[in-house]
Each structure stands twice: as C-alpha cells, then as structure tokens.
C-alpha cells in the first residue's frame, strides 16, 4: 500500500463522514473537501504507527464536531481499509495508522514495476516553466555562486519535469556593457604586456584567452588602432569565454535549451511592447523628462524610471521586455535564480509582474542563493590558480569530482550560506554524504549480484514476511520518496530529495547490518533458499531503484560498484 492509496481511501471515508453530518442537519454546506484536506504524515516516533493524520482536528470546527469524537468516527471506518492493521486515536484528535506487513511490503513490487518512474507525479502536468539560472556574463570562469545555481537549477528542472512540467532551461547573457568593456581592456593589456587595468580582470585565464584571440586573428593586429584592437579582443574574447563557460557547464552535467541575448530584447521590440502595454494599463507616467513605471501601486518602495530623460532605457526596461517576452513565448511559470546581492530586486520585479496583470510568486518566482565557500584544512580557500581572486567551479571539480561537487552544492537549502569541506568530500567514508548514498546504491547491486550467484531470484514475493523492524523502517523511507519529490517541486527545494536519499541510505545500511541473519538476502552456508530470501531481494532491489531515481534527480551518478 502506498501513501497515495491510503490517502485516497481515507479521503473517501472523511467525505462520507461529512455527508452523514450534512444529512443530519449540520450546517457545513460550504465545506468542500480535497485530498489536500486529508493529510498523512510520518510520525516522528515510529512506535506511534506507520502514518498519522490530523484531519479530524483540521475539520472539527467547520464540521461542528469534537475533534476526538470525529477522529474516533473516522478511525473506526479506517480500520476496515484493506491493508490497515489498526487505526487509533491519540492526543487531541490525531489518528495513527499501522499497516499490515503484507500491505506495507507490497510497495517493493510497486517500485520495481514502476522502475525509473517511481517518484514521478502529475503535480505540474503540462505546465510550461521557464527556469533561468547561472546567467553569468562571459567575463570569466563560473564562480562558486554560479556553480551552486548550476547544480541547484538543473536539479530543480529535473524535479519539476518529474512532476509533469515542461521545463525550458534558459541562460540570459550580455556581451556588451561596462563589464565586457573591462574584460576587453584586460585582454588587450595582457596581449600588449601591460599592467591589468585598475578596474580590470586578473588571473591566468586572461592571458590564455588573449593569446588565443591573437593567434586566431586573420590579419595584422599591430596595424590596428588601439580602439580597433580592443574591439577585436571584445568580440573574439567574449565568444571564447562564453564557449568555455558552456563547455564547463556541460562537463558538470548542465546544458541549456535557450541562450537568450540581452540585445535581442531591443532588436525584437520587446522592450517597446512592454512599455506600450504598461501604458495601456495606466501604469506609466512622465516626470522631469523621464518615463516612469508606477510600481508603488504594487508594493514597491518607490516608482521606477524605465526611460531616462536622455532617451536611454534604464536597467529595469530590460526586465520588463524580458518578462513580457517569456510570457509571449507561453511560459506560465517563470523562475529566476539570483545571487544574494540581488535581494533588493525582488520588490520591483514582483511589482512589475503585478503591473502586467499577472500574479507574483505564481507567474514569477525568484529564488535567492547565499554565498558558497570552499574550506580545506579548516581554512577558507581564497584564491584560484587560474582565475586569481575568485574561486571557481573548476577549482571545486578538480578537487573532488563532478558527483561530489554537484551533491555538495545541492544538498543544503539555498537560503543558507554553504561551506564546502573539500577534505570531507574526498573521504571514502560514511562522513561523506555523497559517498554514503552512492555506496548504499552500489551495495544493493553487490547484494543482487551475490544473490544471483547463490541462486536467489525474485520468483517468489511474500511481503507478509517483511516483519523485521529495520524492514518496516526501510519500507517507510521508500514510501516517502514520491511525497518528497512533490514537495521539492512545489517548494523549489531540491535539497529535500538529497536529504531524503541520505536518510534512505541510512535505513538500508541499518537493514544490511543486522547480524542475526533475520534480514539476510543470501543464505548462510548450507541453508536452503527460502521465500523470505527471495522477498528480501525484492526489497533490496527496490531500495536500489529509489536511490538511483533520487541520485538522477540531483544529477549524480549511481555507481554499480565502489
């Protein structure tokens, strides 16, 4: 029995209970129930049962009933659900459910029949989502903040897709502007053997790219004026840098569907269309020769200039055009991942969304990520050999590899600053979280291989034999996985999946470590193969499948052996 099965059965019972109360004259005509009104949770104390619900306490006031009495009514009916061993009232109105071993164990078959689809759902079935992340201008290698967004963004895309969304991964960039000018001047200075400009970019990569630009130029660079030389380095240098960024991200397992150039907003007329639309909606005014958007009407702390008095578009005009462009492309939900230094942008962007007539935090969601630090020998790593003063994605991957890097960056909430301990991630021990999970998966494959050699197969399945406390706990962890994936999608929190498979790995290791033989998949010595061994193989393989599914959602490999 899956949580969804129990939830559906409980929903039917609660609906019937409410209908009975209506029939006896209770004034609950406006009470419309959905499955979400009938929640199931894992009890913190497993001694209380397999599942718990506070549905009676949630509905008692609306139903005009005493919570414990309503809970008792629901529990009495729920005790008759196929696969439920008991339903008991606890405390002020909780209902605790215990499942029969056969019903709980049936999950192993369900998982193996579903395979890679176990954990997927239809929460966002068909929803068109634009997920914009990384979006670093091509002035240098991807820094640690961008690396975090690469791992988190790609994982979130996978999780949203698992819940049925049609996700477009998008990278927004600009190869003009002041940052690019500084980059071009830095390249030119390196080529000419001059000191790095005071506001320029340093690091070994500048010299590398400058040399490539010079080597690839079909002509005599020295014959050009300094301004023309700088334009050569700007154009060719940014192209080389951007290709390097794409290549590094690809090696990190992150690819984008769309690379959106800021200049196209003006070339396509998107900015002008956005301003015209907002004017038609009555949110534009002119003052001191400038064009303003009245964002204070939508909660912003001040109105925003969108066209300066000299006719030049202000920075926010690009945001207006870009958002409208996404909506015109059909995206119903737009997610933008920004660094902590962009926190002040949230108010104005949400006001912009509302000015267009859309819904903040629905049509546009903004995720803010905190800083990332690398730590080695207990001290922060402050310098990159290649990039100078910034520490990069390459530095992290070179130290610990792609899998450990991705897992380390995705397993913590983006709301918190992250210290990545390189020494820990290099360890082949249970202290290392990615090793812990990957080793659990590899162990499931090793057990399966050894079982085959010992003549244990899945020709029999008797889930009622899965009665050991570690088996009940492991089945509980497996049951939780689809719910965790749905929550991760709904809350845009991929770390929930990582933490879930860490917990599952722990439950599996505990099951494997039982020493009295009561959970063994492979018979000892001359012991004959029994249906208990065969059934445990189902549980072993189901665990491997879920670990594999979870690792795939966070973009980490599931090794067959370690």
UniProtKB/Swiss-Prot annotation:
It is found in: Cytoplasm. Its EC number is 6.1.1.19. PROSITE patterns: AA_TRNA_LIGASE_I (PS00178). One of its GO terms (cellular component) is cytoplasm. Gene3D superfamilies: Arginyl tRNA synthetase N-terminal domain, HUPs, Isoleucyl-tRNA Synthetase, Domain 1. It holds the Pfam family DALR_1. GO terms for molecular function: arginine-tRNA ligase activity; ATP binding. The keyword Cell membrane does not apply. HAMAP family: Arg_tRNA_synth. This is Arginine--tRNA ligase.
